[in-house]
A protein has these predicted regions:
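A short, structured N-terminal alpha-helical element that caps or precedes a catalytic domain
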Residues: 1-113
Length: 113
Protein backbone atom coordinates (compact mmCIF):
# COMPACT_ATOMS: atom_id res chain seq x y z
CA UNK A 1 0.00 0.00 0.00
CA UNK A 2 1.41 3.38 -1.05
CA UNK A 3 1.55 6.07 1.62
CA UNK A 4 -0.46 9.20 0.90
CA UNK A 5 1.23 11.93 2.90
CA UNK A 6 -0.69 15.15 3.55
CA UNK A 7 1.14 18.04 5.17
CA UNK A 8 -1.02 20.63 6.96
CA UNK A 9 -0.25 24.05 8.40
CA UNK A 10 -2.24 24.63 11.59
CA UNK A 11 -3.68 28.07 12.47
CA UNK A 12 -2.71 29.54 15.82
CA UNK A 13 -6.12 30.97 16.63
CA UNK A 14 -5.07 33.74 19.01
CA UNK A 15 -2.22 35.91 17.73
CA UNK A 16 -4.13 36.86 14.60
CA UNK A 17 -6.30 39.29 16.57
CA UNK A 18 -3.26 41.33 17.62
CA UNK A 19 -1.66 41.66 14.19
CA UNK A 20 -2.31 44.42 11.70
CA UNK A 21 -5.25 43.29 9.56
CA UNK A 22 -4.18 42.14 6.12
CA UNK A 23 -6.49 39.30 5.12
CA UNK A 24 -10.06 38.99 6.43
CA UNK A 25 -10.85 35.61 8.00
CA UNK A 26 -14.41 35.74 9.27
CA UNK A 27 -14.43 37.97 12.34
CA UNK A 28 -10.63 38.28 12.60
CA UNK A 29 -7.59 38.88 10.41
CA UNK A 30 -4.54 36.79 9.66
CA UNK A 31 -1.21 37.78 8.20
CA UNK A 32 -0.48 35.37 5.33
CA UNK A 33 2.44 33.11 6.20
CA UNK A 34 4.05 30.95 3.54
CA UNK A 35 4.60 27.36 4.75
CA UNK A 36 8.27 27.31 3.69
CA UNK A 37 9.27 24.66 6.24
CA UNK A 38 6.52 22.32 5.06
CA UNK A 39 7.53 22.85 1.43
CA UNK A 40 11.16 21.99 2.24
CA UNK A 41 10.07 18.84 4.07
CA UNK A 42 7.86 17.86 1.12
CA UNK A 43 10.85 18.23 -1.20
CA UNK A 44 12.84 15.84 1.02
CA UNK A 45 9.91 13.37 1.18
CA UNK A 46 9.63 13.35 -2.61
CA UNK A 47 13.40 12.85 -3.00
CA UNK A 48 12.97 9.72 -0.87
CA UNK A 49 10.42 8.41 -3.37
CA UNK A 50 7.16 9.23 -1.62
CA UNK A 51 4.43 11.55 -2.80
CA UNK A 52 3.03 14.32 -0.65
CA UNK A 53 0.52 17.12 -0.82
CA UNK A 54 -0.12 20.26 1.19
CA UNK A 55 -3.29 21.58 2.80
CA UNK A 56 -2.64 25.15 3.95
CA UNK A 57 -5.22 25.26 6.73
CA UNK A 58 -3.53 28.29 8.30
CA UNK A 59 -4.18 30.56 5.32
CA UNK A 60 -7.40 28.95 4.04
CA UNK A 61 -9.15 28.79 7.45
CA UNK A 62 -11.69 26.14 6.37
CA UNK A 63 -14.75 25.20 8.40
CA UNK A 64 -14.94 21.74 9.97
CA UNK A 65 -17.17 20.67 7.07
CA UNK A 66 -14.57 21.86 4.56
CA UNK A 67 -11.84 20.01 6.49
CA UNK A 68 -13.89 16.80 6.39
CA UNK A 69 -14.59 17.23 2.67
CA UNK A 70 -10.89 17.76 1.89
CA UNK A 71 -9.73 14.83 4.03
CA UNK A 72 -12.33 12.51 2.47
CA UNK A 73 -11.25 13.59 -1.01
CA UNK A 74 -7.51 13.17 -0.41
CA UNK A 75 -7.75 10.00 1.76
CA UNK A 76 -4.33 10.40 3.39
CA UNK A 77 -2.62 7.54 5.24
CA UNK A 78 -0.20 9.91 7.03
CA UNK A 79 -0.92 13.50 8.04
CA UNK A 80 1.75 15.89 9.24
CA UNK A 81 0.49 18.81 11.30
CA UNK A 82 2.83 21.78 11.57
CA UNK A 83 2.09 23.76 14.72
CA UNK A 84 4.49 26.66 15.15
CA UNK A 85 3.22 27.96 18.51
CA UNK A 86 1.62 26.55 21.65
CA UNK A 87 -1.40 28.68 20.70
CA UNK A 88 -2.00 26.15 17.91
CA UNK A 89 -2.94 23.38 20.37
CA UNK A 90 -6.75 23.85 20.25
CA UNK A 91 -6.67 23.60 16.44
CA UNK A 92 -4.27 20.63 16.52
CA UNK A 93 -6.71 18.87 18.84
CA UNK A 94 -9.73 19.77 16.68
CA UNK A 95 -8.09 18.67 13.41
CA UNK A 96 -6.74 15.46 14.99
CA UNK A 97 -10.20 14.51 16.27
CA UNK A 98 -11.68 15.01 12.80
CA UNK A 99 -8.93 12.90 11.22
CA UNK A 100 -9.22 10.11 13.82
CA UNK A 101 -13.00 9.95 13.37
CA UNK A 102 -12.69 9.71 9.56
CA UNK A 103 -9.66 7.39 9.52
CA UNK A 104 -9.23 5.45 12.81
CA UNK A 105 -5.87 3.96 11.76
CA UNK A 106 -4.28 7.08 10.29
CA UNK A 107 -0.82 8.19 11.38
CA UNK A 108 -0.87 11.75 12.71
CA UNK A 109 2.54 13.37 13.10
CA UNK A 110 2.93 16.70 14.90
CA UNK A 111 5.93 18.93 14.44
CA UNK A 112 7.14 22.49 14.47
CA UNK A 113 8.22 23.55 10.99
Amino acid sequence: MQMKILMCSVPDGSLSNTLKPLLPRGNHYQVPIQPVGILRLMTWIEKKGYSSDIYDINNLRPSDEELIENFKRTKPTVVGLSATLSHCYPNVKRISKILRKLFPNIWIVLGVI
